[in-house]
Design a protein with these regions (language model features):
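Short pre-catalytic strand/loop immediately N-terminal to key active-site residues, enriched for Gly-Thr
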Residues: 30, 86-99
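N-terminal beta-alpha supersecondary unit
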Residues: 2-83
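Structural signature of cysteine-dependent C-C bond-forming condensing enzymes
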Residues: 80-86, 154-158
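ATP-dependent small-molecule kinase catalytic core of the GHMP/sugar-kinase superfamily
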Residues: 2-7, 11, 15-31, 120-185
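Solvent-exposed beta-strand sheet faces enriched in polar/charged residues
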Residues: 15, 45, 55-57, 87-91, ...
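DPxDG-like acidic metal-binding loop motif
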Residues: 69, 98-126
């Protein structure tokens, strides 16, 4: 497959308990997460030139190794010695720094895309295992749905689906880094 389009779905936390801080700086949590149909559009195209080219519609987003989508592509392409390259175009719609896993969902979508585009044969579980090395929400974004997350967010238990409903998401004109919030706890 030389081209594909993917939807990187956002998520909301229906409940979040922070249980304690680990020595490595991560926090033990118990939370219920729900996928929402607000998504970033990701287009991927195989290229003959080795490497990763990342483009985005938001000028202030990094398009290098500081971007989780780039890191996800780099992780699998290095591990599996992919000789070709990939061009990733990211059209952001999930609010940035809103706690909706925008970066993590982009990484999950790119993991799925690289796996499929280059026929790597990884299972969902294997993608989730690699995803946790990129961020605690990435395994959830690979799994999606209504899920109880424990540990640092990587121990996932599917729950019965929430009833279909409309959700109003209001994002004020300020941004809050999830990483910084957890560091302050």
């Amino acid at each position: 497959m030389d081209k594909m389009e993917l939807k990187a779905l956002g998520k909301i936390n229906l409940g979040l308990d922070v249980l304690g801080r680990r020595e490595n700086g991560y926090h033990d949590v118990r939370m219920v997460m729900q996928t929402v149909y607000l998504y970033d559009q990701i287009r991927m195209e195989k290229t003959k030139k080795p490497g990763i080219e990342l483009l985005t519609n938001l000028f202030y987003l990094p398009v290098n190794e500081n971007n989780l989508a780039y890191q996800a592509a780099d992780l699998l392409m290095k591990e599996f010695h992919v000789k070709e390259g990939v061009k990733i175009t990211l059209d952001k719609h999930i609010p940035v720094a809103a706690g909706m896993a925008g970066g993590s969902s982009n990484a999950a979508a790119v993991l799925f895309g690289i796996n499929r585009m280059f026929s790597l044969g990884l299972s969902q579980k294997e993608l989730m295992e690699r995803g946790v090395t990129l961020g605690a929400d990435v395994p959830y974004c690979v799994m999606r749905g209504t899920v109880l997350a424990e540990g640092i967010g990587e121990i996932l238990t599917p729950l019965p689906a929430c009833p279909k409903c409309h959700v109003l998401i209001a994002k004020p004109p300020i941004s809050v880094s999830t990483k910084l919030v957890y560091e302050k706890l």
